[in-house]
UniProtKB/Swiss-Prot annotation:
It comes from Photobacterium profundum (strain SS9). This is tRNA 2-selenouridine synthase. One of its GO terms (biological process) is tRNA wobble uridine modification. It is an enzyme of class 2 (transferase). CDD domains: RHOD_YbbB. Belongs to the SelU family. Monomer. It catalyses: 5-methylaminomethyl-2-thiouridine(34) in tRNA + selenophosphate + (2E)-geranyl diphosphate + H2O + H(+) = 5-methylaminomethyl-2-selenouridine(34) in tRNA + (2E)-thiogeraniol + phosphate + diphosphate; 5-methylaminomethyl-2-thiouridine(34) in tRNA + (2E)-geranyl diphosphate = 5-methylaminomethyl-S-(2E)-geranyl-thiouridine(34) in tRNA + diphosphate; 5-methylaminomethyl-S-(2E)-geranyl-thiouridine(34) in tRNA + selenophosphate + H(+) = 5-methylaminomethyl-2-(Se-phospho)selenouridine(34) in tRNA + (2E)-thiogeraniol; 5-methylaminomethyl-2-(Se-phospho)selenouridine(34) in tRNA + H2O = 5-methylaminomethyl-2-selenouridine(34) in tRNA + phosphate.
Length: 364
């Protein structure tokens, strides 16, 4: 039997402790943005919510509530209640929420109570939780930070994940920010990106972090935008530069963009389709920068890429990927980053190889 608990009005520990959350909103609302530990078990499905909303506008709250009870009744109500009971019993430390902590939360609580379960809700609902996370991001933006920069393949993302005070923007966005930046899984929505980012910040704060390290990023990471307050703070922060040799950087890129992506596509889609999707992924990445390469050079590097993939598929060797990655770095990515870095020259406070920069940042 679940012991009665108070409704939740203090949100920090909810996120720091990865507290399970049951989201009562409709699937369309959930898809637009939710929280890392939330599961959608809606009171109403999309069409039901739409019908109730239309009724509310035309006839008022009482009529809308009556329609809601009519739509969610009998077997439908029993099935949803069974889902909620299972969640509550599996997650005795969890909470439920709707958009504002209003009618949907109270009805769910009431039905659960009638079934013998006293389950608490989040006061203020999704809206209050979301506001708290946005405020967290803005608070971190006001704290000391250092940016780790360096040419493509310098291991910046690896480094921020290895540092106790590192914040992985690309991980939060589920995108690596370049033309080749997508993962096998879909990129997060803007809201989900911000929510995941804020939760990571809360956890770092709980560990005592007061100085944060971010990877040098532009405003856009794939289709996501770095929150304005963080982007502005990064634009004024000290910069530490990783200067690693070209061969080391190419090895990292082969591991990240070739070995990992091929493995992940096959794991998700099977051997044949996995190879097809992996090939399409690399070719789309090259296609995305064709105008900057110029069509002649694009076609040459695409041919080298296709040959490297064919050899990899034939005998498992990876060496031929050097034939397109090396010129891509020398001719495109390195000059582009050199130009971007020239605008930050007055903020560079440290340079070194990967281990030197990591050790220096670890003392922050």
């Amino acid at each position: 039997m679940l012991m009665p608990r108070q409704n939740c009005e203090v949100f920090r520990q909810l996120f720091v402790n990865d507290t399970p959350l049951m989201d009562m909103r409709a699937p369309i609302e959930f898809a637009q943005g939710a929280f890392p530990t939330s599961i959608n078990h809606p009171l109403m499905e999309d069409e039901e919510r739409k019908a109730v909303g239309t009724c509310y506008k035309a006839h008022g709250q009482d009529a809308a509530i009556a329609l809601g009870h009519q739509l969610v009744n009998g077997d439908i109500k029993a099935a949803r209640l069974a889902q909620w009971k299972a969640f509550a019993e599996e997650n005795p430390n969890g909470y439920l929420y709707c958009f504002r902590g209003g009618l949907r939360s109270r009805i769910t609580q009431q039905w659960l109570k009638e079934a013998g379960i006293d389950y608490p809700m989040v006061v203020g609902g999704y809206k209050a939780l979301r506001r708290f996370l946005i405020e967290t991001i803005d608070t971190v933006a006001q704290q000391p930070m250092t940016i780790v920069g360096g040419n493509t393949g310098s291991g910046k993302t690896i480094m921020v994940n290895e540092l106790a005070n590192g914040i992985d923007l690309e991980g939060a966005a589920n995108h690596r920010g370049s033309s080749f930046g997508r993962y096998v899984t879909a990129q997060r929505t803007q809201i989900d990106f911000e929510n995941v980012l804020a939760v990571e910040m809360l956890k770092k704060q709980a560990q005592g972090c007061t100085h944060f390290v971010f990877e040098d990023e532009g405003r856009a990471i794939g289709s996501a935008s770095v929150p304005l307050s963080i982007n502005a703070a990064m634009g004024n922060a000290d910069v530490a530069i990783v200067d690693d040799p070209l061969d080391v950087r190419i090895d990292r890129l082969i591991d990240d963009y070739v070995v990992r992506m091929q493995r992940d596509y096959i794991a998700q889609n099977g051997e044949q389709q996995g190879w097809e999707l992996f090939t399409e992924y690399l070719e789309r990445g090259m296609f995305g920068i064709r105008k900057r390469l110029g069509m002649k050079r694009y076609e040459e590097l695409l041919a080298a890429q296709k040959q490297a993939i064919a050899t990899q598929k034939s005998n498992g060797t990876l060496a031929e990927h050097d034939n397109w990655l090396r010129p891509l770095l020398i001719e495109y990515y390195d000059p582009m980053y050199t130009y971007q870095l020239s605008k930050k020259a007055d903020r560079i406070v440290f340079r070194g190889n990967y281990q030197e920069v990591k050790s220096w940042l670890a003392d922050k």
